[in-house]
C-alpha cells in the first residue's frame, strides 16, 4: 500500500481530531493508524513499536490498563504521544 505524504498527513490529522473531540477512542485510533496509514499487520506493527502483539491487541480492543510507555510506543511513529488536555465544561 502506497499513499502520498499529503494523504498520510490528512489521515493522521483526521484521527488526531477524532481523539481530541472524543469521537474516536484510543484503541480505534491505533487500529486506524496501523491499518490505514502503515498498512501493517499487528505482528509487524508490534515489532516496529517494540511491544508484544498481545499488548497491541489489548490496546486496539480497549482492554486492560495499558502503560503510558506502551501507548506512546504506538503513537510515536505518527509524531504523537499521550498527553493531558483540559476538559471543557458546558455551562
Show the residue positions of the predicted features.
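Short amphipathic helical patch at the helix-1/turn junction of helix-turn-helix
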Residues: 24, 35-36
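Residues within the helices of the helix-turn-helix
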Residues: 31-32, 43
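DNA major-groove recognition helix of helix-turn-helix/homeodomain DNA-binding modules
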Residues: 67-85
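Short alpha-helical DNA-recognition segment
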Residues: 39-57
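Residue-level signal for the short linker/turn that defines the boundary of a DNA-recognition helix
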Residues: 28, 38-41, 66
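N-terminal flexible/basic segments that precede or flank functional cores
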Residues: 1-28, 89-91
